[in-house]
Amino acid sequence: MAIPINPLSDKSVAYRSVVDFYSARSSFAIPRKVILCLTDRCNMRCNMCTLQHTTVEKKELEVSDWVEAIEELSWAKPTFLLFGGEPLLYENVGSLLDFLCQRDCPVEVVTNGFFLEKYVDKLIAVDARVTVSMSGVDKVHDNIKNCPNSFQRIAGFFDFLSRHAPAYFSNVGVNCVMTPDNIDGIEELIHFLSSYPIHSLSLQHMQFSSVALRNMTDQFWKKAFGASCTLVLEPNVSYEYDDAYLKRIKLLSSVVKKWSGKMNISFFPALDSPDIDNYYSDRRHFLCGKDNVCLKPWRVPTICPNGDISNCSGMVLGNIKKQSFWKIWNGEKNNSFRDSLISHGSFPFCTRCCSFYEKYDLSGKLNVDE
């Protein structure tokens, strides 16, 4: 399937305008959020997960390497997002949280919730904003996560906060990926969460790809950048997104409205009814987010467990063990990538990536409340 890309399109013009607005078009871009992927390891194997997690020990950065990277970046006061795998499985995550507390930078943690009680004191000390992945209530959650008692571990953490640190709930959000496995249990999850004063609940549409899209992206990557794309967005379980499922997703809007006065609930991406149909279509998902602008290559670097720095899924710029962050992030390879993105407006797989749908406030920071 050919992708219509016009370098002189309105999207390209819009890109130049937005990137200029955020003063990011120069060759020196300052990150607003830095994703620290501490480990690829995870104690769960979620049905909808597209990351190739493993329980096998792999070479990971020493905590001293992370400290050095944070020190190099901390003058810019970005938000440091601890990610994985399961970031709380990283052997020295406690020491890293202690160091981040000293640097007085905003901290976020995305976690499956299994180890939250173990690190709750350190998370509170650093005032971390925590996003917990939940898929439902009781066995629905456990079965999707393929991890017995995982729901009870999260419920235990919430009960702990209720007794000992209720004010910290304002830092706690829940993300629920919608799938055919849990779509009929979403309201039960909302009802459960309504017992706790959490900050927000995000109902996320699946991230998924296909062999055809991966091959198309790889061909584009080789032509544009002379390298293969390592992007893999294939969940552990292959789902069918038929009309009946899409109808059930759309019906959730009325459920969310019913709870709107009691909880802060949103969909991500925020799609209207026609775009829901497009998003789940292999042929029409390119029509989604036609006015969207992705600033990840300027604003949100990812540092992988082995030290690789990525600006976009499937693109490695360099490694912090071999070169300084700033030389990599604002080097020739990333600036060339940014120019290509501005010219094309988007790449074939962009509408399948969550970064494509992120919103930004006027400072260029991610608007996490949307």
What are these regions (language model features)?
Residues 2-129:
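Conserved alpha-helical substructure of the radical SAM core
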Residues 129-135, 139-306, 310, 320:
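Radical SAM enzyme [4Fe-4S]-AdoMet core and its adjacent flexible, acidic
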Residues 70, 94-98, 120-124, 155-158, ...:
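Short amphipathic alpha-helical segments and helix-helix/interface helices
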Residues 1-30, 284-370:
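Flexible mid-to-C-terminal extensions adjoining Fe-S/redox cofactors in radical SAM and related proteins
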Residues 92, 205, 313-316:
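Short clusters of small/polar residues that mark proteolytic maturation junctions
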Residues 55, 86, 136, 207, ...:
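Flexible, active-site-proximal loop/turn residues at the rims of small-molecule/cofactor binding pockets
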Residues 58-60, 142-146, 314:
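Short, solvent-exposed loop/turn segments at secondary-structure boundaries
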Residues 72-75, 124-125, 166, 195, ...:
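Alpha-helix termination/capping residues and helix-transition junctions
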